[in-house]
Amino acid sequence: MNALQEDTPPGPSTVFRPPTSSRPLETPHCREIRIGIAGITITLSLCGCANARAPTLRSATADNSESTGFKNVPDLRTDQPKPPSKKRSCDPSEYRVSELKESLTTTTPSRPRTARRCIRL
């Protein structure tokens, strides 16, 4: 009574369930798309579809599918350690040297000192 046909297009009260297969159909008009997300690869076989180009910043042809994305984005597929970050030294002698340099530059007098002459009458 509630049997669903797998080849019927979706209607107002019908659930459309397309046939699923683990192997792609062998036709000259099939396109295979591989999508990699967080270590998982999804392979889509699109058969009987028309070719349409929609260039975006992340689009690539099937031949160049490994070269998508920006150059500055790190490759998350490898587990390489991060390079050590530059840390400030906590050596007290270095702090004193920088403190002395600051005090020498900030305590310069506003006008040069001159010898005062006293005039006696």
UniProtKB/Swiss-Prot annotation:
It comes from the Viruses. Residues 1-28, 57-121 are annotated as: Disordered. InterPro entries: CAV_VP3 (IPR006858). Transmembrane segments: none annotated. Pfam families: CAV_VP3. Coiled coil: none annotated. The keyword Transcription regulation does not apply. Induction: VP1 and VP2 are detected 12 hours post infection, while VP3 only after 24 hours. Residues 88-102 have a biased composition (Basic and acidic residues). One of its GO terms (biological process) is symbiont-mediated activation of host apoptosis. Keywords: Apoptosis, Early protein, Host nucleus, Host-virus interaction, Inhibition of host mitotic exit by virus, Modulation of host cell cycle by virus. GO terms for cellular component: host cell nucleus. The keyword Coiled coil does not apply. Belongs to the gyrovirus apoptin family. May act as transcriptional regulator. Induces apoptosis in infected cells. Element of infectious replication cycle. This is Apoptin. It comes from Chicken anemia virus (isolate Japan 82-2) (CAV).
